[in-house]
């Protein structure tokens, strides 16, 4: 791998500054409008054209086919649903129509409920992003009657139904690790950073991925513009149970998910680039399949291969839209302590800038 990316290039500090800045702007699932407008301004200030649709911000440089990237920008949070009543935003009944029960997040959200206790939260106005108050989660539990997580929050009893509540967050750095609610603001930061450094392709910033809806926004854009591609590259984080598991690779690829196989020249290109540049990678579907063999031998239920935004797009388009995923391995999934290695982030930046920017990032 390029030594300059292992040994922290000068331009990595601006990336961290950008990530810190984006993390501070809330973007709860179903209430992403103010964050999308924030991204729109950041892009237009550097001369990138944008179009804002319902649930989708499309950015295009001077060479729109030189890379087609996508990243969801919603983050897990809470919605006020009544007098002193708060529910997990992504799994509200009105948001569940596209959830099939086969995503990794749906299988794990019950297990992580207690991680949110004592978490500071902030309420905001969903259109302007204006601050509406600070609170603290006192309890979180599964309510079987409504099939959702219920939160007891101190300090926000004045809120009206429909008000989004984000987990109060800031980027933390310790040694070679960074932590925050990284899923998936870190991918948005990567794309903005690439544009700042010469990327001229197309990027999609999608809403409501955590509610299983983001694929619709991208798919509809391709359909109404009568465009097909086999080079859509979706950026995201990929959860692992332990740091040891996560550190076995710098980047995570996929051959398939539960919905579809990924048949794209980009997948082969990514694998070849990683081999050539000594970047350790793994394929998440292979990792899960190997884990399931052990689970079956021990009489444990098998894990889902996971449902991705790209898999739904490939399936619904009958393969007319194809691509692959490029993910950062993390631990602490769906919390404000989600952790990634700096080497992983640098590897992703190195890969994307080498593939899509004619003149690589300044050293």
Which ranges hold each PLM region?
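N-terminal hydrophobic/helix-forming segments and targeting peptides
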Residues: 1-363
């Amino acid at each position: 791998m390029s030594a300059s990316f292992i040994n922290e290039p000068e331009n990595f500090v601006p990336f961290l500054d950008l990530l810190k800045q984006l993390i501070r702007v809330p973007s709860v699932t179903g209430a992403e409008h103010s964050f999308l407008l924030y991204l729109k301004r950041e892009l237009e200030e550097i001369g990138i054209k944008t179009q804002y649709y319902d649930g989708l911000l499309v950015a295009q440089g001077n060479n729109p086919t030189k890379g087609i990237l996508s990243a969801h920008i919603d983050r897990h949070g809470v919605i006020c649903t009544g007098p002193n009543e708060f529910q997990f935003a992504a799994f509200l009944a009105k948001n569940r129509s596209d959830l099939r029960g086969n995503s990794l997040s749906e299988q794990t959200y019950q297990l992580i409920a207690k991680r949110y206790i004592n978490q500071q939260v902030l309420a905001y106005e969903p259109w302007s992003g204006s601050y509406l108050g600070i609170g603290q989660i006192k309890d979180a539990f599964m309510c079987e009657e409504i099939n959702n997580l219920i939160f007891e929050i101190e300090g926000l009893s004045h809120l009206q139904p429909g008000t989004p509540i984000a987990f109060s967050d800031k980027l933390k750095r310790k040694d070679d690790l960074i932590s925050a609610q990284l899923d998936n603001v870190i991918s948005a930061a990567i794309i903005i950073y690439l544009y700042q450094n010469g990327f001229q392709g197309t990027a999609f910033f999608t809403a409501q991925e955590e509610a299983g809806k983001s694929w619709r926004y991208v798919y509809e854009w391709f359909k109404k513009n009568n465009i097909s591609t086999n080079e859509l590259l979706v950026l995201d984080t990929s959860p692992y149970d332990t740091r040891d598991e996560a550190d076995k690779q710098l980047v995570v690829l996929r051959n398939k998910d539960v919905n579809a196989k990924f048949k794209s020249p980009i997948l082969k290109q990514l694998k070849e680039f990683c081999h050539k540049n000594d970047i350790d990678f793994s394929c998440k579907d292979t990792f899960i399949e190997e884990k399931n063999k052990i689970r079956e031998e021990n009489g444990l239920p098998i894990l889902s291969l996971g449902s991705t935004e790209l898999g739904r797009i490939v399936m619904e388009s009958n393969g007319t839209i194809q691509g692959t995923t490029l993910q950062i391995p993390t631990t602490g999934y769906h919390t404000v302590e989600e952790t990634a290695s700096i080497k992983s982030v640098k590897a992703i930046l190195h890969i994307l800038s080498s593939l899509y920017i004619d003149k690589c990032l300044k050293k």
